């Protein structure tokens, strides 16, 4: 019975690994080969079934022959996937328990007086509990170990703000950024830099995606090659790159790289030196502006660096505005003293000189 239970457990574990095998995860390949060899061994012990054992060895050989096919280092942790695998494995364990009881009962009715190996329903229940404990434990261990491995080995997790800002400063001395580049200094993103193609992107992981803010910065003549390189880098760890807010002039590069598009909105830029409110269109705006100025409100732009007193005032305003909510970050920015001190600050003060 030990070999029978072990064979069942190994089969369920291989079923669990099927998703990771399909995803070409390197660790799944190693475990699968080990489980197949053990399965072949216990199949022989269970009933000296040479045909089944040979078939498992053939499958093992195919795995070994396709070793290079499994190239991914890791996969993103997902509670949904973990729970789904636990439910699927439990379904098969319950199916084993009830079908085993039914088969034994039918066999006993046909062959009265024959002693059965599992003579009572409790034997199947006890076996199911044991198998559940082992298989579910394996699922939890498998996912948590991968999560721990990711924390230790994902290359971007070791990046510090100083490292990111130095890399960004260096590339911006040669190439211009875009309207979103300054948000990288908010410190809530990681970067990927290609020294070969002289390009850089800022991104943040979310579920199985690496969300990239804007277009790559640097030598845009190498953009297509860089997009391919970054996709291969993300794919190595089981992620998919997603680009947020890209420039229209680069759409052909993204299209040729196989990306699909989803329009969320449009962006408008205004040349301030040519901007005027003298028209019927801005009548309501002028009225509001004049009323605020009459009430003592004043708009001004302060050059950096800013005093600690000013920073503390705007931090108070920021906290009052947020309330119990959290900072959005990413493309919307967040309150960060170092980030604020990197650029001019636009403020509105009331008649008492307080920032509102």
Predicted ranges, named:
Residues 74-79, 282-289:
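Short intrinsically disordered coil segments
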Residues 1-158:
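Topology signature of small-to-medium multi-pass alpha-helical membrane proteins
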Residues 220-232, 242-243:
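Conserved acetyl-CoA-binding loop-helix of GNAT-fold acetyltransferases
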Residues 266-267:
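A glycine-rich helix N-cap at a beta->alpha junction
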Residues 229-233, 253, 291:
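Alpha-helical scaffold elements within enzyme catalytic domains, especially in hydrolases
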Residues 3-7, 41, 149, 153-215, ...:
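A conserved beta-strand-loop-helix scaffold within acyl/acetyltransferase catalytic domains
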């Amino acid at each position: 019975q030990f070999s029978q239970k072990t064979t069942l457990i190994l089969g369920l574990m291989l079923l669990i690994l099927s998703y990771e095998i399909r995803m070409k995860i390197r660790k799944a390949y190693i475990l699968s080969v080990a489980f197949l060899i053990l399965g072949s061994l216990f199949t022989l012990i269970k009933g000296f079934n040479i045909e089944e054992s040979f078939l498992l060895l053939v499958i093992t050989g195919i795995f070994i022959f396709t070793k290079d096919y499994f190239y991914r280092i890791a996969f993103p942790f997902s509670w949904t996937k973990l729970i789904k695998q636990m439910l699927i494995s439990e379904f098969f364990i319950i199916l084993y328990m009830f079908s085993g009881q039914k088969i034994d009962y039918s066999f006993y009715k046909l062959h009265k007086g024959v002693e059965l190996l599992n003579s009572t329903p409790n034997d199947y229940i006890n076996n199911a509990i044991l198998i559940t404990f082992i298989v579910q434990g394996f699922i939890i261990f498998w996912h948590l170990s991968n999560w721990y491995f990711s924390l230790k080995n994902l290359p971007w997790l070791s990046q510090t703000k100083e490292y990111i800002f130095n890399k960004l400063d260096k590339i911006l001395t040669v190439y211009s950024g875009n309207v979103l580049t300054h948000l990288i200094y908010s410190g809530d993103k990681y970067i990927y830099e290609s020294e070969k193609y002289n390009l850089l992107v800022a991104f943040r992981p979310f579920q199985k995606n690496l969300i990239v803010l804007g277009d790559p910065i640097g030598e845009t003549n190498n953009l297509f090659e860089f997009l391919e390189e970054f996709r291969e880098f993300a794919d190595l760890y089981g992620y998919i790159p997603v680009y947020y807010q890209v420039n229209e002039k680069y759409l052909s590069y993204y299209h040729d790289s196989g990306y699909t598009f989803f329009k969320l909105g449009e962006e408008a830029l205004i040349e301030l030196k040519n901007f005027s409110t003298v028209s019927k269109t801005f009548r309501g705006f002028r009225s509001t502006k004049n009323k605020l100025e009459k009430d003592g409100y004043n708009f001004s732009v302060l050059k950096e660096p800013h005093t600690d007193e000013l920073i503390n005032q705007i931090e108070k305003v920021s906290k009052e505005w947020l309330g119990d909510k959290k900072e959005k970050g990413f493309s919307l920015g967040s309150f960060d003293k170092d980030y604020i001190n990197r650029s001019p600050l636009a403020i509105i003060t009331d008649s008492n000189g307080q920032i509102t």
